[in-house]
Design a protein with these regions (language model features):
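Short beta-strand/loop turn elements enriched in aromatics
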Residues: 30-40, 104
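Active-site-proximal cap/loop segments of hydrolase catalytic domains
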Residues: 41-343, 347
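C-terminal, loop-rich substrate-recognition/catalytic regions characterized by aromatic stacking residues
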Residues: 2-32, 44, 312-451
Length: 451
């Protein structure tokens, strides 16, 4: 008997779906139809007018390989040309650009909402801009989201197969030039690793902007430490669906604490299987996505790949006007066959962070880490609380109380000349818990104890 990975997952009832045209955006009510949105239209107060006429195909059904039907919104230039498609895969609601929760979020960040048209799915490309430049934008509700059938899973092979099916469906449509790309930040980035690894024939290129690639190591047990808080918030942000179930990662953390569990192994992206061109965006400061983005970049099977390491938060970076223009050069080259010189772009560009605010950006190099860097080891000096070049000759025990301030031990290093840190930092620690009875066990993957 073949056991599907979904049989191993733990599910809970989805949250109730509110279909009032407000909670999930002004265009969220279920109304399968074609709408002509005229240039200059204001989708909602506080957003910018549309850049061009857009044909909106609303709540279009797409049948997946197992018979489940999902629904997607598709935005097209209002002409008869065949166009490439940008796909934004996520569980956050295909029409939620004007939802109060996201309007408030971007206001809180100081970005406001006038940078987009209101058609923009959370963390996704703005259809107004891309339709004006000859692209279609596909905003699907994945299975178990809003009116899409089935139960929602989070990260892994089920989503990857569904994304594959959507890509191949798009390629068969009369308005499609058969070329597609995946783009977006965060969830819309890490879903790309999984979908692209399935190698859909009509996926042309990808643009992951900061995305984890291992559901266990990057999300649930970061550094081996359980982190249920963010997962709970992530699951709450999933748009719900009436009568559906959602995968409950918190329950799975309790049931499957080891990375060897099938559920967690299914959530590891094999980016070596990705062969399409990739424009990968990373940063040093995203505790959720940094490790997975760099790991994926290193392991990518793509022969044509670019890495840009920026000095901002992912959303201001992704929606910055100049960065959008550069992304269009990448897509124009592969999706519209424009000979715009993108292939001559430096394979790696990185930033240097200066704590006085004088950051240096877009330093070009052929590899990352840059070939001119050298790995340097530093050792703790427990007596001076500094870092030194050589290991000490005597062992010294340092203690701190986790229940009182400062709750940490710090070490400093003062450099006598200008020094730049570029590369993946590594730290090896030896720690011991005192005055506790500790029981050590080792288990096989089948749960058999070995003492």
């Amino acid at each position: 008997m073949v056991v599907k990975i979904t049989d191993k997952m733990k599910f809970s009832r989805s949250f109730d779906y509110v279909d009032n045209g407000i909670e999930h955006g002004v265009l969220s009510k279920f109304e399968p139809k074609e709408i002509l949105l005229k240039k200059g239209t204001l989708i909602a107060e506080g957003f910018k007018p549309l850049d061009c006429d857009i044909k909106m195909l609303k709540d279009v059904p797409v049948k997946l390989r197992d018979g489940v039907t999902i629904y997607t919104d598709i935005y097209l230039p209002n002409n008869c040309k065949k166009v490439p498609t940008l796909i934004a895969w996520s569980p956050y609601g295909k029409s939620a650009g004007t939802a109060p929760r996201y309007k408030n979020l971007f206001n809180m960040l100081g970005m406001g909402n006038a940078w987009n048209s209101g058609l923009t799915k959370f963390e996704a490309p703005d259809p107004s801009y891309w339709c004006a430049h000859g692209y279609a934008v596909c905003n699907p509700d994945m299975r178990g989201i809003a009116h899409s059938e089935g139960n929602t899973t989070m990260v892994g092979s089920q989503e990857a197969q569904d994304g594959y099916d959507l890509i191949e469906w798009i390629a068969s449509q009369e308005w499609s030039n058969s070329k597609t790309a995946l783009t977006g930040t965060s969830y819309l980035a890490f879903s790309q690793w999984y979908i692209a690894a399935e190698q859909p024939p009509h996926l042309t290129c990808i643009n992951p902007t900061e995305g984890l690639s291992d559901g266990y190591r990057d999300l649930a047990f970061i550094g081996g430490i359980p982190d249920k808080n963010f997962i709970e918030r992530l699951q709450v942000n999933h748009v719900s669906a009436k009568g559906a179930k959602r995968e409950n990662l918190v329950k799975e953390m309790d049931c499957y604490p080891l990375a060897t569990a099938e559920v967690w192994k299914d959530k590891v992206a094999d980016t070596s299987k990705i062969t399409v061109p990739a424009f990968v965006i990373a940063s040093y400061s995203n505790t959720l996505h940094t490790m997975g983005t760099f790991r994926s970049w290193r392991n990518l099977g793509s022969k044509e790949k670019w890495l840009r390491i920026h000095d901002k938060q992912e959303w201001p970076y992704y929606y910055d006007k100049d960065n959008v223009e550069e992304l269009r050069r990448f897509f124009d080259y592969y999706l519209l066959d424009k000979d715009n010189g993108w292939n001559k772009t430096s394979q790696v560009r990185y930033s240097l962070i200066d704590f006085q605010g004088n950051n240096t950006n877009d330093i070009s190099t052929g590899t990352f880490p840059p070939s001119e860097t050298s790995n340097t080891k530093y050792f703790f000096n427990p007596l001076t609380r500094t870092l030194q070049d050589n290991a000490g000759k005597t062992d010294v025990v340092l203690r701190y109380d986790t229940q009182s301030l400062p709750g940490k031990i710090s070490f400093q290093k003062t450099f006598d000349k200008k020094t730049t840190f570029v590369d993946y930092p590594k730290l090896k620690l030896y720690m011991e818990v005192e005055n506790y009875n500790v029981e050590s066990q080792r288990k096989t993957r089948h749960g058999v104890k070995r003492i």
